[in-house]
Amino acid sequence: MSKLKNKKRHLEENEEEQLPIFDKDSGEDGHLDDGDEDPADLSDSEESVFSGLEDSGSDDEDDDEDDDEDDDDKDGSEEKSSDAEEDKADDDDGDLKLSAKDDVKPQVDSQNSKEKKKKKRKGKSVLKDGGEEDVASGRDEALKITSQVDEYDHDTSDEEDIRNTVGNIPMEWYKDYPHIGYDLDGKKIFKPIRNKDELDEFLDKMENPDYWRTVQDKMTGADIRLSDEQVDLVHRLQQGKFGDVNFNEYEPAVDFFSNEVMIHPVTNRPQDKRSFIPSLIEKEKVGKLVHAIKMGWIKPRRPKETTPQYYDLWAKEDPNSILGRHKMHVPAPKMKLPGHEESYNPPPEYLLSEEERLAWAAQDPEDRKLSFLPQKFSCLRAVPAFSRFIHERFERCLDLYLCPRQRKMRVNVNPEDLIPKLPKPKDLQPFPTTQSLVYRGHSSLVRSISVSPSGQWLVSGSDDCTVRFWEVSTARCLKTVQVGGAVKGVAWNPNPSICLVAVSYEDSVLLLNPALGDRLLCTATDQLISSYAEPEEVKEQPVQWLVSEGEGHEQGHRLVLKHPKAVRQVTWHAKGDYLACVLPDSSSSVQVLIHQVSKRRTQNPFRKSKGLVQCVSFHPVRPYFFVATQRYVRVYNLIKQELTKKLMANCKWISSMAIHPGGDNVICGSYDCRLAWFDLDLSTKPYKVLRHHKKALRSVSFHSHYPLLASGSDDGSVIVCHGMVYNDLLQNPLIVPVKVLKGHSITHDLGVLDVTFHPTQPWVFSSGADATIRLYT
């Protein structure tokens, strides 16, 4: 019975644990059955392998031998050992049969087992008689077979196939390099050549059936085709399922300790004997504690002292200490020590001149840097008594008991950390840096300038009642047109297909055809103006449209618009058909007029104007109209005819305004030396206020293509700033002053009166009170 039990146990263990050698042999041989197997089919190498395994021994065989020795007598030990060898051979045969297929249980053939036993005994005797060489050869062959099975075949790792050794870093660091990392040998891994354009990508998307499952490896830059298992895993994760297909998240739960009251206990183990007997260990501990109390080693705890519920706040204070009486005592600040200006014989540079004395007397007492005038005496005997001594002592006493004091914690801050980190100007090029040309010809203030859309011609208007046309590249005056008053503003039509210039002087707006450049363009402009047909019903308009004839027509005059009041500014719409004029007069409701040249119509967009209008401008893209008064900039929607936004400039008097080509940013210059930048998407208050100029700003301008803006001031300088507006709405505009351009001389306390940029080049023009126009490139 013991032998049968041992064999049965060996068969069960071999079913659970099989050697990889047998798995390999079974995969090659196919299904192994008792009826098909023949002992003669086994080769010598296989016999040597099995014999080597038998010689190595195992715990199971030792257990079998121990069981056989316990069951049988000592006299039959030889027979039992031979039976144990037969059991080993049977176990080996069982292993071969079980390795073929798990679900097929082998049947033991008695005849084949006897032949195998004989063969095993014969092989074993040969090993014993032949010596150690045959045993060693058998073991070597067994080791060769076992070495063919790699124990790491089933191990997986996320970084086995990664050839790039850069580590877990952002791969964007290598976007500007031709390589993407380094391999195990330290050599560069170059990026794959990607010369596909959008057409190739579209063809690949249409023709390649694996396009949808091809992804790019960020570590190597190569294209990887996802397998079906990986695609299935991605789909499952997108659907919120588990990655493992075989995982069942809804397995039935077995409530072992259910809410049902059971009759019998879960475990019916009887209680131990020690649960009924007092513990000896506790008895020893109690005895030690009693002995320690008797010896006085352990003393009882003292009762806690009961503290009163209400206590005296000043019970432990020293009444004689100053800090005890005045917890928040702050010493009075010491008086400032006298300087050189308070000396009876100060250095000459500390003595004020007559102009400085008058300026000091005109200032308020709170604004004066010194409360006295420095005086010089020949000797100390000549110094008179201080007349304001009692008054000064009285003010000191008032400061001591009336002015509150507080402690301020000083924080050591590096001043360089407070300065914003701005890029260097050389990294923001191109921008104008030097004065290249000076346009001379006017005899008075040049109040306004404008550049043609092609950038070849320049028009300027002056107080000498002339309008001059210049060639930009040579500074040559090509044409001079006389008008009937001081020119306040000029504006070249921004439409490149129309050659027309608007000039404002006194109460008139003159439309000129300069006849410069392409003759076909000039002729087409004249035909466009002359093709106007008067409507049958003529409505009353606030402006008279007059057609120029005779000598004026020969000089280029085409239309004259007579206004009821003086015109200060003219500006064109981006399409070139609408013209806006400003008539600053707070007593009248007609301060802004919009003219349509093609239909010769004029309309007043506002019933009443809130404040004195300074300047107006059209939005470059949208139907918005910007109106700047003294302190506010109002944005109107011309289609809905309503107020969209009201910008607060936080300055005393707005002088000029410019709109960014994108239309989302506005800059305003003021007479109180401020330049305010508005971000329409951010707030109605200025995003930044620049105070770089020392005197009033007269003009501001944006470049149509480059991120540049310029401001002209009465201090005779033009400051060029880099104003980058990003497409990302989360990133604020970058404003960096890059250059201060000087060249104009201050005349009658006036400096630069107007600035404008070249339409295509990073050049800026400026006109000043010195009757010159300067080009900076």
From Swiss-Prot:
Keywords, A to Z, come to: Nucleus, Repeat, Ribosome biogenesis, rRNA processing, WD repeat
A Pfam family this chain is assigned to: WD40
Which cysteines are cross-linked by disulfides?
Answer: none
Establish whether keyword Disulfide bond is in the entry: no
Query: Where is this protein found?
Result: Nucleus, Nucleolus; Nucleus, Nucleoplasm
A Gene Ontology biological process in which this protein takes part is: maturation of 5.8S rRNA from tricistronic rRNA transcript (SSU-rRNA, 5.8S rRNA, LSU-rRNA)
Which stretches does UniProt call biased (Basic residues)?
A: 115-125
A molecular function GO annotation: ribonucleoprotein complex binding
Q: Which family does it belong to?
A: Belongs to the WD repeat BOP1/ERB1 family.
Name of the protein this chain belongs to: Ribosome biogenesis protein bop1
Phylogenetic lineage: Eukaryota, Metazoa, Chordata, Craniata, Vertebrata
Gene from which this protein is expressed: bop1
